[in-house]
Amino acid sequence: MARTKQTARKSTGGKAPRKQLATKAARKSAPATGGVKKPHRYRPGTVALREIRRYQKSTELLIRKLPFQRLVREIAQDFKTELRFQSSAVMALQEASEAYLVRLFEDTNLCAIHAKRVTIMPKDIQLARRIRGERA
């Protein structure tokens, strides 16, 4: 191989760049003053499990009373106008409706688990209703 001529390069001093790099690194690692603290977040699923335990312990109604009452009146208008309801009748309808929905979701969850899934899907609800004999 042929030798090449090396040209002289201007030196910048050996220690100056190192000192500059050290100050940059120190500036980056130092905590930012007045920084906004990130809000605490639970891991995915933790809050869901907590809510499941909470609602399984409780006995209160889960659907708000007035929206449910409006829904009952709207459905009843299709059959007969000017129907009147006792408050105890609306409460009985709400208790029965919520009990039905809770059982349906329990069966739906079992259908999803049977399919080796943890997420319920419309096909699970359809299967649960079909097994119950509600829908042919």
Swiss-Prot record:
GO molecular function (one):
DNA binding
Task: Please list the coiled coil stretches.
Answer: none
Pfam families noted in UniProt? Histone
- Posttranslational modification: Acetylation is generally linked to gene activation.
Q: Where does it live in the cell?
A: Nucleus; Chromosome
> What are the N6-acetyllysine sites (modified residues) in this protein?
10, 15, 24
Keywords attached to this Swiss-Prot or TrEMBL record, sorted alphabetically, are: Acetylation, Chromosome, DNA-binding, Methylation, Nucleosome core, Nucleus, Phosphoprotein
Stretches for region Disordered: 1-43
List Phosphoserine occurrences by residue: 11
Q: Which SMART domains match?
A: H3
User: Principal place where this protein is found?
Assistant: nucleus
* GO cellular component terms attached to this protein's record: nucleosome; nucleus
InterPro entries of this UniProt entry? Histone-fold, Histone_H2A/H2B/H3, Histone_H3/CENP-A
**Modification sites for N6-methylated lysine:** 5, 10, 28, 37, 80
Query: Assembly state and interactors?
Result: The nucleosome is a histone octamer containing two molecules each of H2A, H2B, H3 and H4 assembled in one H3-H4 heterotetramer and two H2A-H2B heterodimers. The octamer wraps approximately 147 bp of DNA.
Q: So what does this one do? A: Core component of nucleosome. Nucleosomes wrap and compact DNA into chromatin, limiting DNA accessibility to the cellular machineries which require DNA as a template. Histones thereby play a central role in transcription regulation, DNA repair, DNA replication and chromosomal stability. DNA accessibility is regulated via a complex set of post-translational modifications of histones, also called histone code, and nucleosome remodeling.
Which family would the database say this protein is a member of?
A: Belongs to the histone H3 family.
Name listed for the protein in its UniProt record: Histone H3, embryonic
Q: Which organism is it from?
A: Strongylocentrotus purpuratus (Purple sea urchin)
